Every structure is written in C-alpha cells, then in structure tokens.
C-alpha cells in the first residue's frame, strides 16, 4: 500500500512540474515571437532611415487569409513587396501557433489592397501606410503599431 501511495505522490509531483514547465515554455515562445516581429519592424525602419541602398524598406507579413497563421515576416528593400530587390530579403519564420488576429494598415499612400505590409520612406522612415497588426501566440496577444512617422510600439 505504501508503494502505491509513493508512486501516486511522485506521479502528482511530476504532473504539476510538467504543467509548470509547459506554461513556461509557452511564455518563452510567445516572448520570442514578439521580439522577432518587433525586430523585423525596427530593422526595416532603421534601414530606411539610414537610406541603405537608397531604397524604401518594408516588412511583409506572410499569413494565410483563412487560418490566419503567420508563417513568416520578410524585411525587404523596395517600394513594395512585389517590387522588392530580393537580394536584400531577410526572412523570419514563426511557429504555427502564431496567428494574425487583425491587420489594418491605412494612410495617404497608394493602397494596394494588401494589408500584409508596411513600407518606410528612405531617410525619414515615414510610413505611407500605417496602422497595427494584432498577433496571438496560444493565449497571449500583442498589438504592434506603426505610426505615420515610422515609430513602432508593442503592447
């Protein structure tokens, strides 16, 4: 009887430890995904402000319109993702647990109907299309906002 009780106690302790480790692992993945997305936006803004290559710089978010799963973020050089110079591409991939809840970029720029990208002007890093994207990782949600002046914030 004591052996059964000991095994049960060990199993309970193991289950509690596993739950704690699983929760910590999810928190780390959520923080990593947020940091990667912030890095993509700030890199594009900084490259534009420095005038690297004389190009506008942007970030294209590749996500499925149906499932909303964010597969990657590409920092690119060019007036748009479609017109970019692919030799400058820097791609960050995301785990399948990262989804785009909403993506709303507006402004005086020429809308392409593509709310998957933001482009920063050379030297000023002003954003012709600006707004926010809300991303969820498991149970955590973050809002990434780009101002008309190219400022990036994360909540």
Where are these regions (language model features)?
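N-terminal helix-rich module
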Residues: 7, 12-155
């Amino acid at each position: 009887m004591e052996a059964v009780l000991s095994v049960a106690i060990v199993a309970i302790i193991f289950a509690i430890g596993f739950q704690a480790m699983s929760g910590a692992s999810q928190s780390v993945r959520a923080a990593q995904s947020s940091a990667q997305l912030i890095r993509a936006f700030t890199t594009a803004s900084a490259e534009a402000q420095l005038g690297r290559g004389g190009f506008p710089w942007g970030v294209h978010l590749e996500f499925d319109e149906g499932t909303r799963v964010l597969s990657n973020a590409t920092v690119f050089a060019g007036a748009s993702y479609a017109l970019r110079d692919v030799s400058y591409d820097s791609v960050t991939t995301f785990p399948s647990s990262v989804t785009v809840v909403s993506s709303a970029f507006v402004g005086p720029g020429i809308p392409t109907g593509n709310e998957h990208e933001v482009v920063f002007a050379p030297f000023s890093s002003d954003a012709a299309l600006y707004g926010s994207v809300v991303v969820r990782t498991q149970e955590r949600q973050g809002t990434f906002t780009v101002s008309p002046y190219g400022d990036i914030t994360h909540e």
